[in-house]
Amino acid sequence: METSTQRTGSHLAQTAAARHSASSRGEAARVSSRDELAEMAAASQGNFEGKFESLDLAELAKKQPWWRTLFGQESGPSAEKYSVATQLLIGGVTGWCTGFIFQKVGKLAATAVGGGFFLLQLANHTGYIKVDWQRVEKDMKKAKEQLKIRKSNQIPTEVKSKAEEVVSFVKKNVLVTGGFFGGFLLGMAS
């Protein structure tokens, strides 16, 4: 005698097997609920017949600089892929946007710093704030000594490698870089 639990279990196994065979024939299997998805996952445990290779995305990202995804897999100059006008347009538009944003943020930052300095001077002259200049001088001397101790003439290897990548990109893509700097200056002026 078969119980309802056994019937349900065998029904689930038949459903999963039917779906697995349908998907293996190339037909699209539709999953209508989470329960069916869980059933399919449970039924397919250990039924993989091929060897799968894992892909380490962190290692791949280290080997693929961002400009390769933007300009293509070739690391060669973009002059081989795009016309002169296209390169100048790409560089000019991105440079203009960057310059415009830099100008707006720079104005806001300069206003905040200048306004804060103005308010501090006003508060100092009206007597709300008293500055202990001897203590400021003593703290500045301490900071100078600490900077002299930590001073190193060597550039870290990470910074050096990134700088080399940037220089290489600039050399290979002169038109895009020139367009960017021209657009940046236009964006700063507008």
From Swiss-Prot:
Cysteine pairs bridged by disulfides in the record: none
Keywords assigned by UniProt, alphabetized: Membrane, Mitochondrion, Mitochondrion outer membrane, Nucleus, Phosphoprotein, Transcription, Transcription regulation, Transmembrane, Transmembrane helix
Modified sites of kind Phosphoserine: 10, 54, 152
Biased composition (Polar residues): 1-13
Keyword flag Transmembrane helix: yes
Compartments (UniProt record): Mitochondrion outer membrane; Nucleus
UniProt xrefs under PANTHER family: FUN14 DOMAIN CONTAINING (PTHR21346), FUN14 DOMAIN-CONTAINING PROTEIN 2 (PTHR21346:SF5)
Protein's UniProt name: FUN14 domain-containing protein 2
Taxonomic placement: Eukaryota, Metazoa, Chordata, Craniata, Vertebrata
Gene name of this polypeptide: FUNDC2
